[in-house]
A protein has these predicted regions:
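Conserved GNAT acetyl-CoA-binding A-motif
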Residues: 126-137
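GNAT-family acyltransferases
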Residues: 1-100, 168-176
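Conserved beta-strand-loop-alpha-helix junction that forms the acyl-donor binding cleft
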Residues: 136-146
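Conserved acetyl-CoA-binding loop-helix of GNAT-fold acetyltransferases
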Residues: 102-105, 111-124, 128, 147-151
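Catalytic cores of nucleotide-sugar-dependent glycosyltransferases that transfer UDP/GDP/TDP-activated
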Residues: 72, 131, 159-162
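Residue-level recognition of the GNAT/N-acetyltransferase active site
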Residues: 102, 106, 139, 162
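Conserved catalytic-core motifs of GNAT/GCN5-like acyltransferases
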Residues: 137-138, 153-171
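Short coil/turn motifs at secondary-structure junctions
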Residues: 89-91, 108, 141
Length: 176
């Protein structure tokens, strides 16, 4: 059985792979959920510094909330497979349209069950930071993400429309 590692806080050791992850998503054209500002930050070292700042409540930019960035890595070849971000609490936008957790699996590694495993591995951390339940949203029609959430105990709450992206989002809660 394949061993996976969930690594808290990206490090310089993964800078090249973070750049490759970003490039793969930009070429694919998909959403980079759970990566914070990776789409707009080209330099992986700058991205790593940004992630470190966001975990520290004293250093997080004023319009954001503290968040912890995780990398999902396959142990046998040390390949970066996915990213997941845990937001420690809500602001208005997160409560309505993003939730506590965002995640993505690189396009070339999808449909292998990695998202389900990555989410499961992240839930104990959510308990550690004091959350009793987590809100996760997915675009209506994203059956892969919906299956991932349901497999981890997600309970459907409602569907909301996000006007900025003009999409409907399904809201799920997972009790910890």
């Amino acid at each position: 059985m394949e061993e996976l590692l969930l690594i808290r806080q990206p490090s310089v050791a993964y800078a090249d792979q973070i750049a490759e992850y970003r490039k793969e998503f930009l070429e694919y054209g998909g959403s980079m959920d759970g990566t914070g500002p990776l789409r707009r930050i080209e330099d992986p070292h700058e991205y790593i510094r940004y992630c470190q700042e966001c975990e520290d409540p004293a250093r997080v930019p004023a319009h954001l909330v503290p968040a912890t960035q995780f990398l999902l890595v396959r142990k046998n070849d040390d390949k970066l497979l996915g990213m997941l971000q845990v937001r420690h609490y809500f602001n208005d936008y997160l409560e309505k349209y993003a939730g506590h957790i965002g995640y993505s699996i690189r396009p070339s590694e999808r449909r292998k069950g990695y998202a389900k495993k990555m989410l499961k591995m992240a839930l104990p951390y959510c308990r550690e930071i004091g959350l009793e339940k987590v809100l996760i949203l997915c675009v209506d029609g994203n059956t892969g993400s919906e299956k991932t959430i349901l497999a981890n105990g997600g309970i459907y709450e409602s569907t909301v429309h996000e006007p900025d992206r003009n999409v409907d989002l399904k809201r799920y809660w997972i009790s910890l």
